[in-house]
Every structure is written in C-alpha cells, then in structure tokens.
C-alpha cells in the first residue's frame, strides 16, 4: 500500500499527541519489577508498547516482540532477573540486530542466556533467576537501551549494580530519563561521577503514574510548521520541564523558524520568520530526531552537517543509507563519513517526477518524509502502516490538519 499526500496552503490544528513510547516502556518494566497493583495511566497505544504489555501480562513461554527493539532489550534484562524459562524472538530484521553486548553484560551478573540460532543475535533462550549483581564496565557509545535495560533491573539485584561507562556516552538524556523514572518508583540510583552510575539493592515501590505526551512525535509537527507557508499548531500534553531528551528539538527548530509558546495544556507552534543559513548539530543525544531534521533542512535549502549519528546504523534500518537513497529521489545528494556524520552542502540532481519514498519497515522514515508533501505534491509514502510502531494515529492527525491522503497505485 502507498499513500499519495497533498498539503493545505496553511496549517491550523490542535493535536492530541500520543503518550511517550520511551516513558511507557520504561514504566512498564519498572512497574512489573515492583510487583504492585497500582495503575499506569495514559500508556502509549503504539505497537512497541502493546508488545511489551502483552509480554508482561500473558507470560507465554515464547515471546514474539515483532519489530520492537526496545522491547527486545528491556525484556531480555527483565526476563533474566525474574524466575521462568522463556524464548524471546522477533521479525527477520530483529534477528539481524546485534544484542551480544547486553547478553555479555547480563551473563557477568549471573544470567543464563543462550543464542537459539546465530551467536550474538536473537532469538534468545533465557532461564530467569535471582541475579547477584556486580560492577560492570561498558563502552559509553553502545545503545543507551542496553544501559537502561541493565539499570532498571539494578534495584532487584542482590548486591545492586555499579555501572562504569568508558569513552563518549551516547544518548545521555535517555539514560537520565531511565534514572529519573527509577527514582520516581523509589529506587536509589544516581551518577557517582561523569562516567559511573550506582544503583543500590533497594526495591521499587509501586505507585500510580501518568505518562506524558511524546516529544519525538511532536518533532513531525515542528517540521510541518517549518515547511508550511503559514502555521498555527497546538500540541497538547507537552511541558517545558520534560523528562524526555527529545524536547531539545524545540531549541533546534527555533533556528529553523519555528517558535514555541508554552500554554496551560501544552505548546503552540508558530513561524517566527527567521531561519539560519546553515545548521551544524550534534545528534548524539537526540538520534531519533535526525531524519526529521535532514528532510527539513534540505527542503528549506539549509546546508547542514550532522554528527553523532553512529546509532542510526543499527536502528529499524540503516537510517543513514536510507536517508541518502530517499533524499536523492527528491533531488538532494547527501554525504556520510565514518558511519556517524551526514551532511548536505547544497548539491542537487534532477528530482523524480513522482517520488515514492520507501520506508524500510521504519516508522520514522514514513513520518519524516510525509511533511515533504508541502513541497512535493506528487510524493507517495510506501508501506505507510509502519507508523503504528510509535504513532498509530499519525495519518488521522494529518487529515485533521488538512492534508489529503489517498491510496496510491502500486
């Protein structure tokens, strides 16, 4: 299936954003480890979170997390530290995504994990047990989800957890998000130095908890505001002092002409008429926003150099290669370096007359390219249903904002 998109001349809309996937998934693991009955409110309705809920509530011996990378990592640690024998698997792409770093770390803590097929990759057979805990050292540039997975089981380890990180730490805001949520549920967990985190063996307390809206989802509406001739967009459920690192996107979009006004119910986006001539930005802390800014800058004719993209190679797809391929269809030649830098210096080629954007089973590819319809009225998005991974209501929300969406020809 493909969607053929058309954009209105001006955007005026009020959008209820989905709940934060990052907070929902962490809260579910922590809540399960607390073994309480209090309610988690406003959980995300995205695929990733629904997979997590199913795994935690049904207790099946074989757990299929489909394409949910967060669930694979968080559940691997959770299942290792709780009694029971399970096999955890996923899609073909999920079985190609490495997990050896996390498995090795869990084995150091005493976990019993076996690879079912290929060494270093899912599926995994896990015999859960009480883990002793110890000091672990990891490179700081590994996926922050590995680090968060280990941290969240820290309070239930017999001796707690001392986690030392070496070198540059990637996605530090996601680590801080995990620590803040752990503290909200009664854990004693904190940085003891710039490179070390201590988690005491102190049980979680179960309590009612409400999940805030998703700043990652908000980024696509900032993008729409930036690309539109006129825009007045209200997004509910977002706050100035957010746990989410992706809230920094508001600061970066301010340089691309989008002003943020905080209201009692959320935020209001308006164009402020000023845009930088070039954007150089480090995305090491906000990698999930990279695709959005690549498309936005190119369409605004703003050359850019984005660094800190090393984690994009092991996401739902190789996002660096995907961006280079799909942006070329729109007439832009991107260059990458060292698997961590992506840039555009203004180089153009002839665009395709009717570009069809491949999404590579990646929700963020679909949502980052859909707003390009504002500049490309013939653009089509292939496999649009992939947005259900994080923002199931995305296409309906675009319709509310005045976008036309038709099923295109294959």
Curated annotation (Swiss-Prot):
Q: In which pathway does it act?
A: Metabolic intermediate biosynthesis; chorismate biosynthesis; chorismate from D-erythrose 4-phosphate and phosphoenolpyruvate: step 6/7
Catalytic activity reads: 3-phosphoshikimate + phosphoenolpyruvate = 5-O-(1-carboxyvinyl)-3-phosphoshikimate + phosphate
Per UniProt, where does phosphoenolpyruvate bind? Answer: 21, 69, 97, 145, 319, 364, 389
Name the enzyme group at the top EC level. Answer: transferase
Which Pfam family is one of those matched by this entry? EPSP_synthase
User: In the UniProt record, which is one GO cellular component term?
Assistant: cytoplasm
Q: What residues does 3-phosphoshikimate bind to?
A: 21-22, 26, 143-145, 171, 288, 315
Q: Where does it live in the cell? A: Cytoplasm
User: Which processes are annotated in GO (biological process)?
Assistant: amino acid biosynthetic process; aromatic amino acid family biosynthetic process; chorismate biosynthetic process
Protein task: Catalyzes the transfer of the enolpyruvyl moiety of phosphoenolpyruvate (PEP) to the 5-hydroxyl of shikimate-3-phosphate (S3P) to produce enolpyruvyl shikimate-3-phosphate and inorganic phosphate.
The entry sums up its family as follows: Belongs to the EPSP synthase family.
Describe its assembly: Monomer.
- Name of the protein this chain belongs to: 3-phosphoshikimate 1-carboxyvinyltransferase
Q: Which organism is it from?
A: Bacteroides fragilis (strain YCH46)
